[in-house]
Amino acid sequence: DTDLRVAADSLAGDLDQQITLSGSVELRQRELLITSPQVELEVDGVLRFSQGLQLQQPGVIMRGREARWQRAALNQGNAESGDVLEIADAEVVLAENGLRATAEKLARNADGQLLIDGGEFTYCAPGDDGWALSAQQLSLEAQTNQVITRGAVLRIKSVPVLYLPYLKLPMSAGDAAKT
């Protein structure tokens, strides 16, 4: 089922321009659940989350201060082709491998690839600052199970110890052989 199901406490607006959903808004598509206090639905297929959102899928949780979801194929009957989700001030947790990341800007495309600008990631537990890799750009590629960084700095106990202009790592913390 590729339909996007929407629930909200209230709905206001004009179908020819923009509809605003507010109060405990939930958007569901297959195993995807997005919750937000308010969502603006625009006629061109863009959904805006100006008051933040939380996205949940099996093994993935994302949160952000605001977001924009371009539903490119909404009018073409193919629900995920070309979809792009952009989140500002994002936090991501991948439960399967323990990866945690923060980002000034995060973009997620239809292939599940996460592109992070001004971000940091670690496999350490919350509250543990054992190590983190901060980077100008991070790419988490689910299909190849790799993290690619550009302009990275390795921090141990929050102290920068190594600059890495380019680095490719396995996404799974247990796959140390590739590291």
Identify the function of each model-found stretch:
Residues 1-179:
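Structural signature for solvent-exposed beta-strand/loop edge elements and short helix-capping sites
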